[in-house]
Amino acid sequence: MEQQKTETRSITAEQRKRVEEVCFRSLALIGRNCEYLEQHFDRTGADESTRQAVADIDTAAIQLDRTLTEAITLLEFLHEDTKPQLYPIDLCELLQQVAAQSDMIRAQLGVDIRLDYGGCTACCVMADRRDAELLCLHLLSNALHASREGGSVCIALRRTESDWQLTVTDDGCGLPGEDVQAALENRRSFLGGAQLGLLLCRECCRRMDWSLQLEPAPEKGTKAVVNIPLYTGESRSDGTVELRTDSETEREQRKYHLRAMLVREMRTMPERGDPEDEF
């Protein structure tokens, strides 16, 4: 009887997929109608409050889409019985793809992105490509959410005796602590989020046997520190590592997908302005 009760209350993968399709289809419909209304207003005119109402609906739909995507991915990870198959990848190349969007970020958010390899030209690590991309994207997204216009985010990579250390440091609102002003600014920066991004980052690290810590930046802001085991697999005679090869089409698809994910993240960012105006 207990087994039958459990089976009745469970949801199958097919049922979950149908729920996802309905949700995303509805969100896409909201987005298309918001776009139509904006074009209609441009032709016929509309007062500022009406335009703002439509913009708010569009922003809420984007945030819901982001939260739903994160929740679904997190549930998939938590329900998987085994960890993903890891392959050697060049982390430097992945970070270059992320940093390649720095011009777009500067133009839209007024935040500078700096990439610092510390003299490294390649960084071979064992990883799942999808998990590594999600991790880098969400660490950058968190840093951008915390940053103000005119701020900067530094993505740095260093090798130690025991591991690679990837850090993402911002000069933004910092971690919420006992200081009331800092806590309020942190809340404003991440207002409207379900705070699934950090959970997703930790889960990506767990699946790849990496580790993640958050700590205060030296002067102001937050530093995310990812410790990655050194590659211990087979190497060629010249010391290089044979990476998993992808076709040119696959590489271009990855770059486009990464950019598309970052564009969506940026559309959920709070409006920039003078922090004194918020309090």
Protein language model features and the residues they cover:
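Conserved micro-motifs of the catalytic ATP-binding
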Residues: 79-84, 124-127
